[in-house]
Amino acid sequence: CIPKWNRCGPKMDGVPCCEPYTCTSDYYGNCS
């Protein structure tokens, strides 16, 4: 999973943010 504040894009790479954080965008955001 991706740690808090790191870049994320679950629709692109399929990797979720670590609990309890969520990505601010499906394609290009950060975990918060």
UniProtKB/Swiss-Prot annotation:
Covalent S-S links between cysteines: C1-C18, C8-C23, C17-C31
Q: Which GO terms describe its molecular function?
A: alpha-amylase inhibitor activity; endopeptidase inhibitor activity
Tissues in which the UniProt entry reports expression: Endosperm.
In which domain of life is the source organism classified?
Eukaryota
Instruction: Give the record's keywords alphabetically.
Output: Alpha-amylase inhibitor, Disulfide bond, Knottin
Q: Describe the task this protein carries out.
A: Alpha-amylase inhibitor. It is active against alpha-amylases from Tribolium castaneum and Prostephanus truncatus larvae.
What information about domains appears in the record's comments?
Answer: The presence of a 'disulfide through disulfide knot' structurally defines this protein as a knottin.
What is this protein identified as? Alpha-amylase inhibitor AAI
| The species this protein was found in | Amaranthus hypochondriacus (Prince-of-Wales feather)
Q: Which gene encodes it?
A: AAI
